Amino acid sequence: MEHTKTRHCGQAGVQDAFRLDAVRDDAGRKALFARMCREGLTGCAMYAWADPREEDWLRLVSAPGRLLLQATAPDGTVLACGLFSPWRGQVREFDFTVFRPAFPLAVPLARAAFRRVFRQTGTSALWGLCPVSNRHAWHLATACSFVITGRLPAACWLARRGVHVDGIQLLCTPETLEHAVAASPSGPRAPQ
């Protein structure tokens, strides 16, 4: 993993310093998958697989051009991970998973990861498609600065249930991110 300086989330009253690291080795990738399995999060993070296996995860996150970030607390506890995949041009598709103990920090963790992706990869926008049934995920995405750009009929395949459901299409740009940060109760963060 590559070390980055500690980031502060910009959420008043929260002890929220953490590191963002790029996960570039299979040991780190496997540890994230094992954590998702232990916390029962693979059904949301990998909804298109009926029974996601470690090799599915490794194939997904290690494909060319993909960036897997991990947020880690100062004590070494992994808080979240985000997968950013090439989609079209300079737009990347995103998937962001917050581990259960860090749920209260989901918004600042995600915003910090999105900011890093914009600043370090030349990404012009982040795009996502979330099953309508995963309300918590798309509500969280809008809190993190994504804009709902549409509802696409039967766009998501829920493999475990064997059904198509509508998808909520989401888009975040550097501008929507900065606007959301500036409008947050704690105000904008110091430049990094």
Report each predicted region and the residues it spans.
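Conserved acetyl-CoA binding element of GNAT-fold acetyltransferases
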Residues: 89-101, 129-131
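Conserved acetyl-CoA-binding loop-helix of GNAT-fold acetyltransferases
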Residues: 103-118
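Conserved beta-strand-loop-alpha-helix junction that forms the acyl-donor binding cleft
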Residues: 127-142, 155
